[in-house]
Amino acid sequence: MQTPTLGQLATENGAQVVGDPDLAIIGLAPLDQAGSGELSFLSNPLYLAQALSSAAGAVIVSAADLERIRAEGQADGRNWLVARNPYVCFARIAQRFDKANQDARTGIDPRASVAADVTVPASCFIGPNVVIESGARIGERVRIVANSFVGAHAEIGDDSLLYANVSVYHHCVVGARAILHSGVVIGADGFGFAPDIGPTGVEYVKIPQTGRAVLGNDVEVGANTAIDRGAMADTVIEDGCKIDNQVQIAHNVRVGAHTVIAGCAAVSGSTHIGRFCVIGGAANFSGHLKIADRTTVSGGTSITKSITKPGGHFTSVFPFLPHGEWERNAAIVRGLTKLRERVMQLERRLRGQSAGTQTSQD
C-alpha cells in the first residue's frame, strides 16, 4: 500500500486538514505513544491533556475540541484532522491500514478436505485441515483458516472470515462480510429435552433440533461464543450485530439488527432482543422474553421480564463497596423479610390507633 497523506485521508473520510495536507501517515498509535509519522485521535475530552502533549504527526479531533486546544494556545504549528465523529473517523482509517496487512493468499491448502460437489471460488483461501462437507456453499473472497469446519449444506457469504477452529454446523447460514473468531460454534443443538417420569425418577428425552442458526450480513462473533440452532424455527442474528467473546445464544433466539452484546452474556431460549440494543457483559436473559428496540442493559444485569418500552436503560447490579461495608449491607438484606413483617405490624397498629382516636372524637 502506498503511504497515504493526511490530505488523502481527509478526502476519503469527509474530514478537514488543519496543518500540512502532504504529511505522510505511516500508521496509527495512541496519543501517548504516537510518533511524528503516526496518526492518533481524541474522542474523549478527558484525554485533552494527552492530545496537547502528544508527539503524534497529526491528531483526529472534533471541531469543538480543536477550539479548546486553540484556547490553550496549543493548536498552531501542529497537524489536525477535524472530523464530525473522531472515533468513527479513526475506525475507518484503521480499516484502511488493516487491509494492507491482511492475508492475501488464495487457493485450497492440499491438507484441506473439500467435498467433491462443493465449488470454492478462486478468490477464496481454504487453510490446512479445513473440512467442508457436501452441499456447502462458499461465497467469493471467503477466508477459512486452519482446522475450521463447514457442515453439509451450510452457507458462507461473500468476504467472510472464519478464523482457526470455527465450526459452522449443517444447514446453517453465515451472511456476507462476517467475522467469526476462533472457537466460535454456529448451530450446535439447542438445550431441548422433554422431562418424563422413569422408573428411577425424572428422565430427559432429547428433542431433535431441526432449525438452523442464521447470521445476517456484517455480523462479528467473538472467540468461544456459541449460537445454537433452533428447535424447529431458526435462531436468527440480524445484520450488523456484534457479539463479544464467550456469549451463549440459545435456541430460537432472535437478536435485532445492529445490537451489540458484550462478553459472557447469556440469552435463554426463544427470547427476542430488539434492534440497536446494547447488552453489557455477563448480562443474562430468561427465556421467552421480548426486549424492545434501543434498550440498554448494564453489565451483570438479570432480565427476567419483557421490556416493552423502547429506549430504556436497565441495571440490577449492586455497585461495589469496601468489603466490610458490603458485609454489613448483606446482613441487612438478609433481614429484610423480618423487617418488612415488623413494619407491616407497626402500620396495622398505627391504623388501629388512628381509628380509635377518630372514634373517640366522634
Swiss-Prot record:
Pfam families associated with the record: Hexapep, LpxD
Highest taxon above the source species: Bacteria
Protein EC: 2.3.1.191
Catalytic reaction equation(s): a UDP-3-O-[(3R)-3-hydroxyacyl]-alpha-D-glucosamine + a (3R)-hydroxyacyl-[ACP] = a UDP-2-N,3-O-bis[(3R)-3-hydroxyacyl]-alpha-D-glucosamine + holo-[ACP] + H(+)
Any Gene Ontology CC annotation: membrane
Record's keyword terms, sorted: Acyltransferase, Lipid A biosynthesis, Lipid biosynthesis, Lipid metabolism, Repeat, Transferase
A biological process from GO: lipid A biosynthetic process
Pathway the protein acts in: Bacterial outer membrane biogenesis; LPS lipid A biosynthesis
Catalytic residues in the record: H251
SUPFAM superfamilies named among the record's database cross-references: Trimeric LpxA-like enzymes
Subunit structure and binding partners: Homotrimer.
Family stated for the protein in its record: Belongs to the transferase hexapeptide repeat family. LpxD subfamily.
HAMAP family xrefs: LpxD (MF_00523)
Chain's role: Catalyzes the N-acylation of UDP-3-O-acylglucosamine using 3-hydroxyacyl-ACP as the acyl donor. Is involved in the biosynthesis of lipid A, a phosphorylated glycolipid that anchors the lipopolysaccharide to the outer membrane of the cell.
Name the UniProt record assigns to this protein: UDP-3-O-acylglucosamine N-acyltransferase
